[in-house]
Swiss-Prot record:
Catalyzed reactions per annotation: GTP + H2O = 7,8-dihydroneopterin 3'-triphosphate + formate + H(+)
Pathway: Cofactor biosynthesis; 7,8-dihydroneopterin triphosphate biosynthesis; 7,8-dihydroneopterin triphosphate from GTP: step 1/1
Gene Ontology molecular-function annotations: GTP binding; GTP cyclohydrolase I activity; zinc ion binding
Oligomer and partners: Toroid-shaped homodecamer, composed of two pentamers of five dimers.
HAMAP family given in the database record: FolE (MF_00223)
Organism: Vibrio cholerae serotype O1 (strain ATCC 39315 / El Tor Inaba N16961)
Gene Ontology biological-process entries: one-carbon metabolic process; tetrahydrobiopterin biosynthetic process; tetrahydrofolate biosynthetic process
Identification of the protein by name: GTP cyclohydrolase 1
Family under the similarity heading: Belongs to the GTP cyclohydrolase I family.
Highest taxon listed in the record's lineage: Bacteria
Encoding gene (name): folE
C-alpha cells in the first residue's frame, strides 16, 4: 500500500475494519501482466465456445476484453486508481444538506459478470469539512468499477465519504437495473432494485431522512 494516496489508504482501511471490502486476494501482477493472462484465458474460453478467432471481427476480442477488465470496468479493484480527493475546511460554515442526485452508475454483477445500470444519490451535512462536488461522482464511479453486489457498493460509498469527511452524517441510495435479472434467469426487463445506506443524523433524525429521500422523487 506504500504507493497509495492517503485518501485511498484511509478508505481501504475503513472498509476492511467494517468487513465491507470487496472479496480480494493479494495480487502483485502488474496491469500488463494481468492483461496478458486474461487475454490468454479469454482466448481459451472463446475457442471452447466454438468461435472462430481468425475472423477479423473476433481476432482482437480477447485483447479487447483484457484491456476493458483491467483499465475500465474492473479498475476499481486497484486502489492506485482511487480518485484524487479535495476536502477543504468548511470556512463558509455551511450547515444545510448538500445533495448530489442522478449520478450515472454502471457496474458489474459479481455473480454473473453482467451489467448493473442505474443512478446514485448522495447527501451529507457539512461539519468541519466539505468535499468537491465532482469528487462524490468519482467515488461512486470508483466503487462501481469492480465486480459488485449493490448492497455492498452502497455501504462502501457511504463509508468512504464518512471517512474522508470525518463525519457520520452521510446518506447514499442507488436505483439500478440488474442484467443478471433482465437478460437471463427470470428475464424481468422492468424491475429496479433500490438500496439505501444511512449514517449519523440521516439514521437518527426522521425529518432529515425524509428530506433526503423525498427530495429524490
Amino acid at each position: 500500500m506504500s504507493g497509495l494516496s492517503e485518501s485511498a489508504k484511509l478508505v481501504k482501511d475503513a472498509l476492511e475494519r467494517r468487513g465491507l471490502e470487496t472479496p480480494m486476494q493479494p495480487n502483485l501482477a502488474t496491469p500488463a501482466e494481468k492483461k496478458e493472462k486474461i487475454e490468454q484465458h479469454m482466448r481459451e474460453i472463446l475457442n471452447l465456445l466454438g468461435l472462430d478467432l481468425t475472423d477479423d471481427s473476433l481476432e482482437e476480442t480477447p485483447q479487447r476484453i483484457a484491456k476493458m477488465y483491467v483499465d475500465e470496468i474492473f479498475s476499481g479493484l486497484d486502489y492506485a486508481n482511487f480518485p484524487k480527493i479535495t476536502v477543504i475546511e468548511n470556512k463558509m460554515k455551511v450547515s444545510e444538506m448538500v445533495k448530489v442526485k442522478d449520478i450515472t452508475l454502471t457496474s458489474t454483477c459479481e455473480h454473473h459478470l453482467v451489467t448493473i445500470d442505474g443512478t446514485a444519490a448522495v447527501a451529507y451535512i457539512p461539519r468541519g469539512k466539505i468535499i468537491g462536488l465532482s469528487k462524490i461522482n468519482r467515488i461512486v464511479r470508483f466503487f462501481a468499477q469492480r465486480p459488485q453486489v449493490q448492497e455492498r457498493m452502497t455501504q462502501q460509498i457511504l463509508v468512504a465519504l464518512q471517512t474522508l469527511l470525518e463525519s457520520d452524517d452521510v446518506a447514499v441510495t442507488i436505483d439500478a437495473t440488474h442484467y443478471c435479472v433482465k437478460s437471463r434467469g427470470v428475464m424481468d426487463a422492468t424491475s429496479v432494485t433500490t438500496t439505501t445506506a444511512l449514517g449519523g443524523i440521516f439514521k437518527s433524525n426522521p425529518a432529515t431522512r425524509a428530506e433526503f429521500l423525498h427530495g429524490l422523487r
